Structures are given as C-alpha cells and as structure tokens.
C-alpha cells in the first residue's frame, strides 16, 4: 500500500538545516520535489558535519604527505608507517553538541565512534586521549557536565578495554553554553593490511554488521551543525546511546573477517548512519548503491525509511563483501552474537536507490551527495593584531612566590588527577608513561618501540592571534612529544569554532589553518586525519577558537623515554631556549593581574625544530635525567611541576637584571625546555649547546625539599603539591 507523500514546505526544509538556495540546488539537481526520505538524506549529507562545506576550501592548504604517510585525510582515519610492517592508525573527532545535552551518553558515544573509525581500518585500538573544554567553574551547569563527561569517557573506554592515557581539561566562561568533547583513538595494524571505504566491483553484496537500528540519534549530524539556543535540552532524544560491550564484540568480529579476507570495503556507521556510510562507499568507488531497508535489522517495530536512513544507533558497520566469502563471514558474526544481513548491492548506475515496503523511497545521484556536495568560500576578515605588552609596564600586584602559590592551585594549572584516575590508563599492560606528564608513552607490542601521544591547543592564543595560535598548538604538541624522547611524525586535528557565517569567526578558522599548515611543514609533521566542528555558539556567543592538535611520535626504544620528575639532588637545571619575558595572553597576566590582553607569544618554528632536535639528542644519549616543556604559566610553574613529581626541591638563581622578575618566572615564551643533567656532565653539555647555537642557561640545581629563589622566601614542595592537587577534587565535591 502506497503511503501519502509528505508535502515539502519551506518550514520543513529549514527544520532540516538546509538553506533556501541549497533546496533550490536540490530541485535543479534531481528535476523534481524530493520525497521526505530524500530530503532527510540531503540534510544529512550536506550539513556541515558531513560535507565540510564551509571549511573544505581551506583544508586543502594543509600538508598531508610524507614518505611515512600511508593514508591521509579522506578515510575513516589516518595511517603512518613505523617500520617492521607496523602501522599506526589514528584520528580525533568531536562530540560536542550531544555531550552538552546528555553528558554521559554524548561523551561515551564520542569515544565509541572514534574507536570504530580506527578499527574499521583494520587496526586494534591501543590508546585513547581526549581534550575537554568546560564552562567557568562557577557556572551552575559546569560541575554536572564535568561529572557526566568524565564518567562517560571512562565508562566506555574502560568497558571496551582500551587505556585512556592523556589529554587536556580546561575551564573558561566562553564554553558555558557549548562544551567541547574531542576524542582521539590510536590503533596498531599491519602496514600491508589496511582496509578502506571505497567500494569496488558491480553486483557486490553490501552487508549490515553489528547492533540493531533504533530511533536514537536521528538528526544527530544535523544537530552537530546547528547553533544552540535555550531550548537545546529538548534535543535529548537525538543523542545516541552506546554499548561498549557490543562494540568490543564488533571489534573482534571485524578483525576476524578481515583476517579471513572477506572484505572489499568497510565503513563505520557514524554521523548520518546508514546514509553516509552507504553513500561514501559508493561515491568513493564511483559506483551506485541499491539498499533494501526491509532487510535492515531493527530494534523497534514500524520504523520508516526516513528513520532507518538517519538513525545514528551505535556499534554498526557497513561492508562490501567478497561474494564467495558470505557463509564464512556470516558464521563469524553469528559466533560473536552480532547481526549480519545483506541489505543491498553495488551497481554501475552512480545512483543511490533506497527501497522499503516494495516502494522506492529515494533515488538520487550518489556523487553529488558525497564528494560533490556544496562548497562555500565564506567571507572572512583577519583578526586585528593586538599590541605587544611590555613587561615593565605591568606592575605585579603580589610577589613571585605568592603568585606561584595562587597559580599552581588555580583551575587553569591545577592537577587533573581527579579526571584521569577515573580512566583505566594501564589496561592492556603497555602504558609506559601515565597521564600527568608532557606526553603519554605506550609500548608497541613487546617493544622496543613506543609511541608518544599528546593533545594540545591554547585557545586564548588562538583568539588573540589565530595564525600564531595555530602555529603554537602544533609547536606545543611537537615539544610535548620531544620532551619524552619521541620523534614527532604526524598530526590529527579537531577544529572547533563558532558560526562560520560570521566573517570574524571564519577569519579565525582561516588564520588558525594557515598557522597550523606552516608549523606542520616546518616541523615535518603532516596532518593525516581530522574533524571540523562549527556552529559552537549559544545565543550568539561563540566559543574560543579551539583547534585541538593530536600528535603522534615514535620512540625507537621506549626504555629511553624521559619524564619530567627531578631524579636526584645536586643536578644542574638548564633552561633551553630564549626567554624574553613575554606576558601577553599569559595565565599570570589574566589570573594574577586581571588583564586578558596583548599579543600572544610569537612562535619561531626554526628555533622549535633546532631546540627540539637537541633535546631529543640529550635524551637518547642519556645525558638528560629529567625534561619538561614550558607552556602555560611559564618557567616557575614548570619547575614546580618537576619538583612535585620528583619530591625533590630546587635552589634557583635570581633572573637576569634585563628582565623583570614576574616576566622571567611567568612569561610564556615558546620553544623552551627545562632539562636536568648530572653536575659532572654540565660543562660538556653547555659546550655542545653553544656550538650548535642553542640558547642555554643554568638557572639553579636540584636540592632539598623546598623551592627557593635567591632573595625570595622558600616554599615547601609538599605545600605546593597540596595546593596543586586540591582544587579539582574540592570543586567536584562542592567545596570550591
């Protein structure tokens, strides 16, 4: 029986997130009014989340190639070669809007989705990281959101069985109505067994794998492409529900059918579910796709074609199967207790045809849905340059030691232990360096190789100067990987911005991308995967521009990794890199002086590369006993973190007369490291560094149980540690 078609009104088009000109483009493309299912398909494929229509033009400027890159952007995840027929597969992706509406499930399914992106490529996940941005601590929703998101990330990762080894947590009032949950997953695969999404061959069976389809997550991708308002909490039904135990079964079943050589192409059902997975597989392979929705396993009776095509139920995959392997593949999935259903086949027509109940519900051109979606060159204006702050013009309201006591326990700089202790960071037994250091270190199989992993960005720099902020995010990832002894190899990015229809916001995105591209070229770390999340604003107020950078580096021998903890008393403390006392956009200027202003510190990429190469050499030769990169909070914060980690104090010289004390100790100049070396090796190290033109200054030595600066009162390391560890648990317990 034929159902009565739904009239397509301007209101219905608008509710699907399509602009009037985009709807006119659809009419011209298909030569008729679309059905409701077709409108839903266009809405899913042409939204910002799936099509990158506002950013695609500018993403083309990113460097994506290197001899060690096996797969760059455009697939489920990026792939790099690390030798010995081993490949690392990794990507970072956002789940921002769902996590604000339903923090536990939003964060959990964000982790689940990124894990699927990695194992779809044939890799076994070995580590997760995340970058979490929350509103101001005093905002009434913040505590609830932190609690839910952290529980969701931990609950999914811990149950699935992958360690969560590092990340970032920040608080800022600009995220009050729009938190960010960026999840990164890293997997290990055989370099000659990488599985891609492009279908090949006509008449090949298309198989639905995994969990059943329900009504959860319908319009999830469209919601991720919209701005928020006061009624956004009503969108809770569009948040997907995750089952990490089903995902673990799906992982094992997928890796088993891959090993059995059953797979032509495979794609995870993520944003826009069955629609995007089927369209992407066909479009990438220059093939059409016919789907029969009567064959789709459903969780609820009476689901319409529209609902099935747009559902974002979790733990599902779509595969193009080698026909002769059907019985073997089905047996594997039945063994793991998962659905296996042939729901369609590839065609030579370049049409996307969807049938349900004996009727054709959609018949559309597949290329125009996929890689030929709309592309916008949106108007953008460059962010105005801010004046350079001169440190001598900033009068310190309190002394250096008082400032240290205040900053080390502040929301910006305090320990994140409360967060990472809720994650299982050692499951699998390969975590060499746990959270709390510059980068996580994960052993590969039984060694000797290891991976250095980090996630970095400084949003306040990106707003003040998007170009320098973009450069700094990459440079910070480079330094963090270097500080543990890793050689940075490649990057995944997660670009979180406000409304791209506002020229100043589009200008932030363009500026950050220019800086990121320049840094990636200079530091030889190409972008191999990524994600763009736009429209992160509530009631017209955008987030801070937050291009999260996920970095992956390689250690030839994980036993030679460095940590930030002081190791012994009597060692020389060296400051590597040039210090000018840059206070613009520093934590000190904001939190101690109450001023959010000035140009951020400039990033000299030549100095970053030169200094990083020297520090890695010191680690590999065994000269460096402790290493820490300098970032938020500057020199004195980094020294305090090293002292706290090692339970050893330091006797520090006063800073040079040319730089005022508060700028020397709290300036945030880039390309700097702190390194300790044994006293008997000091002269040799200083001579070598001078010969290669690397600025280096001995600023003190490790000693005792206090941090003491010449001319200032000493402060006990235990007191610093208490202040550093106290704020977050007190806040989450309602005491701060």
Curated annotation (Swiss-Prot):
A Pfam family hit:
FGAR-AT_linker
Task: List this protein's GO terms for biological process.
Answer: 'de novo' IMP biosynthetic process
Q: Which reaction does it catalyse?
A: N(2)-formyl-N(1)-(5-phospho-beta-D-ribosyl)glycinamide + L-glutamine + ATP + H2O = 2-formamido-N(1)-(5-O-phospho-beta-D-ribosyl)acetamidine + L-glutamate + ADP + phosphate + H(+)
Gene that encodes the chain:
purL
Cellular component GO terms, alphabetical: cytoplasm
Residues involved in Mg(2+) 1 binding:
93, 531
Q: Tell me the organism's taxonomic lineage.
A: Bacteria, Pseudomonadati, Pseudomonadota, Alphaproteobacteria, Hyphomicrobiales
Q: What is this protein called?
A: Phosphoribosylformylglycinamidine synthase subunit PurL
Query: Sorted alphabetically, which InterPro entries does this protein's record hold?
Result: PRibForGlyAmidine_synth_PurL (IPR010074), PurL_linker (IPR041609), PurM-like_C_dom (IPR010918), PurM-like_C_sf (IPR036676), PurM-like_N (IPR016188), PurM-like_N_sf (IPR036921)
